[in-house]
């Protein structure tokens, strides 16, 4: 990791660190990292996704049961690069980053997630998040 990159990493316990959506996008665009979106297939379909991200759900819908194929999927997606993990608001991706680290990967959590925290009215997408920050995303 370059000195410039390390200044953008917030220390974390159990994984390589937390990074902003903009840092994750820069690393992904430069080929330095692979983005793994750990949201469910339903979330990707209904809410939107990041082009180029690899979908490896941490939990599965319905019921949000653990994905038994997570370990295999995240290792295959990494391709020898560091991984940046994205979820809805930056919570599931912490657990996924810890697991990826246990598997021997250099794993980072993307702060704020795809949608960010809910605002005072309970709506997401207005208080932080990949989408609100104007970074690349699509919706089917």
Regions found by a protein language model. Give the residues of each.
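Short, surface-exposed ligand- or partner-binding patches at beta-edge/loop junctions that are enriched
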Residues: 85-86
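Rhodanese-like catalytic fold shared by cysteine-dependent sulfurtransferases
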Residues: 1-33, 41-82, 93-140
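Conserved G/P- and acidic residue-centered "switch" motifs that form tight phosphate/ATP-binding loops
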Residues: 37, 90
